[in-house]
Amino acid sequence: MGLLALGTPLQWFESRTYNEHIRDEGIEQLLYIFQAAGKRDNDPLFWGDELEYMVVDFDDKERNSMLDVCHDKILTELNMEDSSLCEANDVSFHPEYGRYMLEATPASPYLNYVGSYVEVNMQKRRAIAEYKLSEYARQDSKNNLHVGSRSVPLTLTVFPRMGCPDFINIKDPWNHKNAASRSLFLPDEVINRHVRFPNLTASIRTRRGEKVCMNVPMYKDIATPETDDSIYDRDWFLPEDKEAKLASKPGFIYMDSMGFGMGCSCLQVTFQAPNINKARYLYDALVNFAPIMLAFSAAAPAFKGWLADQDVRWNVISGAVDDRTPKERGVAPLLPKYNKNGFGGIAKDVQDKVLEIPKSRYSSVDLFLGGSKFFNRTYNDTNVPINEKVLGRLLENDKAPLDYDLAKHFAHLYIRDPVSTFEELLNQDNKTSSNHFENIQSTNWQTLRFKPPTQQATPDKKDSPGWRVEFRPFEVQLLDFENAAYSVLIYLIVDSILTFSDNINAYIHMSKVWENMKIAHHRDAILFEKFHWKKSFRNDTDVETEDYSISEIFHNPENGIFPQFVTPILCQKGFVTKDWKELKHSSKHERLYYYLKLISDRASGELPTTAKFFRNFVLQHPDYKHDSKISKSINYDLLSTCDRLTHLDDSKGELTSFLGAEIAEYVKKNKPSIESKC
């Protein structure tokens, strides 16, 4: 997420009057983009990753670890007085939803294969954040603030005690009301101070007509309560405070705020394709990799102080920004007295146009983009409503008519309302601005994002980014080594897809992808579940699939990721002759071998996922009471372990347990040179 402009945010009941204006103007901006950049070609494979961190405050005296919401000035300083430090180290920091969060990227994109530099750059980002936080600790000590505590940036997918007592480092956060979210569990201090974020939170709640609602299955142990006993009665907000007992379900962890989802962290990787056609092909080819990589990277086994009976974050974020009204969800409102006919905050004059929408605006991919010789329209076999007005405009116009399949993609995105509108940005020059288009585009959060360039990205302007695809499902991992390994893996897959594009047909039915996303949430899916995976990726095959385990999906000689995508591109680059394991004996690419070994060993179940490691830690902790609850002491010890792992500290044998003896020994002895860019 880039730096945020200041402005005057419009509250939902005012902003909704401009919804159609923003949609209309956004589509005109998109047409100007296609007119300007549609013929762009021969762009190089630039790419880059985005890592999200949680700043965790460790109170060693009280044995409590909390989210740090007191030092969010770090973002301003890193982009102002410390900008030269970031520039010199080729890193860039950006805001995220949580006040305790940092997003960091390379300042300039990578070009093709860059070896260990991905990891080096990640190390630099973490080192700079740690340096700033240590500065604050010294200042706080002088001012007698936060005495005895230390704040560190951890790449955690989820904070295990989010929404529990004493989970943020401010005293008495409940001595005032939390008007933006109205959550029973999250004070508004968890939200980024920038006006966009509390306004977005309130707009989603108001449009929906109810608070958001996420029910995640509890992990069942011998003393697990029948219901979520953290729910309590409150009379601050009517009707919201009446919803919890109606919305929660026995045997489930109940969450009621955007922060539970958008406060999670992830790893995202974006790739520039040579042209729009290759970008569409790449997007479609990666669609079914998304649920596989979600399950493979599982790192979220706990929410709101409970162990969950699932391992990933995705459905929690999906629910956290689900602004669909009861009418759009096809359900009755929780409190009909306050949500007449289930239309929520939708204006009366457009209620007759309301569609039933099967999924949240944060979901898996809904449509293949097509345009490839391998594509058949029947592959899009799911219920995907579209904005017919938008579809018509994209198909028939005098600027840049789109083909049906690409037009349908954008027409589907445009069934959504804008949920973040600034007064100063209502009127724009559609020939030069893409803000209205991005207002809708960037608030459709799917497992992949097809990213058009701007109107300035004409074929001769190679300094402007071209047609890109963002891969979004990865859960963030604890170690820079792990995150670099996962980033390099998806780079190799992308490079393989683009290099051998005439020979790789990755299409399956979209309904199978949706089923895979559900399976990916299951506890230990990497070990015990099977997923729909294509029997063959040859160019003469159809969409036939069979059910395979994650290990088979990675290793099967006929259709596995290693033999069909990774090894061929390594051979093409001259890194190996027959098999990726040859890298172990390469003086130049040994680290790549250990990246791929980590991935292979995780996929085969020889090494635990982060989710499995976390769950086992809790279950084996001496303070655990077999009630599925994560106490302060358990959380403190768990996150202290995460801190040690992050810094490759194997003094307690944790790194060896987590990575296996061979990889742990390698990473301890072989830290990449921060000067190396090969």
From Swiss-Prot:
Q: In which pathway does it act?
A: Sulfur metabolism; glutathione biosynthesis; glutathione from L-cysteine and L-glutamate: step 1/2
Q: Which GO terms describe its biological process?
A: glutathione biosynthetic process; response to cadmium ion; response to hydrogen peroxide
Q: What is its EC number?
A: 6.3.2.2
Per the database entry, which stretches of residues form a coiled coil?
Answer: none
State what inhibits or activates this protein.
Feedback inhibition by glutathione.
Q: Which GO cellular component does the record give, naming just one?
A: cytoplasm
Q: Which reaction does it catalyse?
A: L-cysteine + L-glutamate + ATP = gamma-L-glutamyl-L-cysteine + ADP + phosphate + H(+)
- Give any GO molecular function from the UniProt entry: ATP binding
Q: Which UniProt keywords apply?
A: ATP-binding, Glutathione biosynthesis, Ligase, Nucleotide-binding
**Does this entry carry the keyword ATP-binding?**
yes
| Function (record text) | Catalyzes the ATP-dependent condensation of cysteine and glutamate to form the dipeptide gamma-glutamylcysteine (gamma-GC), the first and rate-limiting step in the production of glutathione (GSH).
Under PANTHER family, the record lists: GLUTAMATE CYSTEINE LIGASE, GLUTAMATE--CYSTEINE LIGASE CATALYTIC SUBUNIT
The further comment given in this record reads: Present with 5130 molecules/cell in log phase SD medium.
Protein family per UniProt: Belongs to the glutamate--cysteine ligase type 3 family.
Question: Under which name does UniProt file this protein?
Answer: Glutamate--cysteine ligase
Q: Which organism is it from?
A: Saccharomyces cerevisiae (strain ATCC 204508 / S288c) (Baker's yeast)
